[in-house]
């Protein structure tokens, strides 16, 4: 099975189209992760600035009874982590700011999706978009190509005649494609850790 896995990778590296798309998705992943990190850092900073401003407003408020102070209200921000650089989840749709005031139950407001163009509501260009839609599609086409090439060249029959079971052959091929996805995921993780090393510490 290890030999099949090794030969599968050798066959993939002989394919110029595979090398081109692997490099293309690798570069695209680096760009998406890098810009996701920049955007996340800006969002964290803007939340800190807003929190500081709200606290300053609260401290500078004139003397009043507690009930009036409760009606003045304040804002709560949903905390942002470094993983938001890869995937925001529902934050861009639901929002990250909640107004707190007495006698009222407000919903989370100021979502980016409500203030953006219709086309951008389908999702931002982030690493999660590549991992959820584009890279799996690439792996499906790649797996179909390897399967059809094995049948057309007669290599599949040759491998079975040599004593390899069909289950082992299929498993080795699946494992080789999953290892490619794991390499791309590792690349995104390394970029994320490298640019957020101080924040992780």
Give short role names for the model-derived ranges.
Residues 24-26, 31, 45, 49:
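N-terminal low-complexity, Ser/Thr- and acidic-residue-enriched intrinsically disordered segments
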Residues 38-42, 46, 150, 194-199:
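Membrane-interface elements of multi-pass transporters and channels
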């Amino acid at each position: 099975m290890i030999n099949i896995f090794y030969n599968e990778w050798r066959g993939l590296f002989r394919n110029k189209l595979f090398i081109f798309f692997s490099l293309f998705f690798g570069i695209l992943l680096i760009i998406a992760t890098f810009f996701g990190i920049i955007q996340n850092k800006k969002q964290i900073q803007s939340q800190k600035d807003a929190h500081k401003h709200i606290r300053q407003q609260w401290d500078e408020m004139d003397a009043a009874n507690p009930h009036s102070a409760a009606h003045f209200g304040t804002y709560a921000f949903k905390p942002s982590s470094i993983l938001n650089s890869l995937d925001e989840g529902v934050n861009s749709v639901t929002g990250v700011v909640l107004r707190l005031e007495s006698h009222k139950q407000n919903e989370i407001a100021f979502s980016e999706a409500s203030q953006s163009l219709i086309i951008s509501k389908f999702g931002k260009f982030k690493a999660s978009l590549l991992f959820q839609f584009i890279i799996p599609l690439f792996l499906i086409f790649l797996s179909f190509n390897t399967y059809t090439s094995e049948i057309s060249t007669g290599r599949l029959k040759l491998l079975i005649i040599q004593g390899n079971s069909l289950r082992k052959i299929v498993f080795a091929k699946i494992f080789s494609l999953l290892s490619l996805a794991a390499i791309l995921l590792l690349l995104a993780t390394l970029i994320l850790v490298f640019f957020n090393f101080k924040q992780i510490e």
